[in-house]
Design a protein with these regions (language model features):
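Short catalytic micro-motifs in class I SAM-dependent methyltransferases
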Residues: 112-116
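A conserved beta-strand element that flanks and buttresses the S-adenosyl-L-methionine
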Residues: 109
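Class I (Rossmann-like) S-adenosyl-L-methionine-dependent methyltransferase catalytic domain
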Residues: 1-103, 117-124, 128-131, 135-201
């Protein structure tokens, strides 16, 4: 379901509204830091070492500082499709749909990116996320269920493609196992997770 036709320039006005303006922002550095702490804790608990992080669609890089403290040995790389942010923060320019580095990363972050892609590109992006990730993936995307029940619509960007959570999970499960809270691990990776700690099937 498309709320509006997708034609979103990710320039200064977009990031001022959704990330910098206290009255309209969708998240804060503190919230993103807590999210990074959760991701790091789950991977540590599962016994998955992290030496390289790719933040695909990193925006302002709000998780970078937290990861530097939580995973000090991990190299962080920000990937952005916004030329404005790449120029400002020196991120790597590219799309999660087809970006291919020389080597995959232990942890790939894809936070609030996939809903900006049409169905074909979103499906391609999930396949590419599997190629980008050596071990783990954190993914979050605004879903139809979130739009109906969870998000603050006065702050949430309407210029997106809404799909069910099931649509994403079905495609992710071809490559990953879900550890919970949006953290997935590659199917060939050994991760010790007790039965009652796993998400319900």
């Amino acid at each position: 379901m498309d709320i509006k036709a997708h034609n979103q320039p990710f320039g200064p006005a977009y990031f001022r509204k959704y990330y910098l303006n206290r009255a309209t922002r969708v998240t804060t550095a503190a919230e993103m830091g807590a999210r990074a702490a959760l991701i790091a804790a789950i991977l540590r608990h599962a016994g998955i070492p992290v030496h390289g992080i790719l933040d695909a669609g990193c925006g302002l890089g709000l998780m970078r500082t937290a990861f530097a403290e939580l995973l000090p040995r991990a190299r962080y790389r920000g990937l952005e499709a916004s030329e404005y942010l790449c120029a400002r923060f020196n991120w790597s320019f590219g799309s999660v749909v087809d970006f291919r580095p020389v080597k995959p990363y232990d942890l790939v972050i894809c936070y609030d990116v996939l809903q900006y892609l049409g169905e074909r590109d979103a499906a391609r992006a999930i396949v590419n996320l599997a190629a980008l990730s050596r071990a783990a993936l954190y993914v979050s995307a605004l879903t139809l269920e979130d739009w109906r029940s969870n998000c603050d619509r006065s702050r949430t960007d309407r210029n997106v493609h809404l799909r069910s959570g099931l649509w994403y999970r079905r495609r992710l499960r071809r490559h990953f196992r879900h550890l919970g809270f949006g953290v997935w691990v590659r199917r060939n990776v050994t991760a010790i997770v007790w039965d009652m700690e796993r998400p319900a099937p």
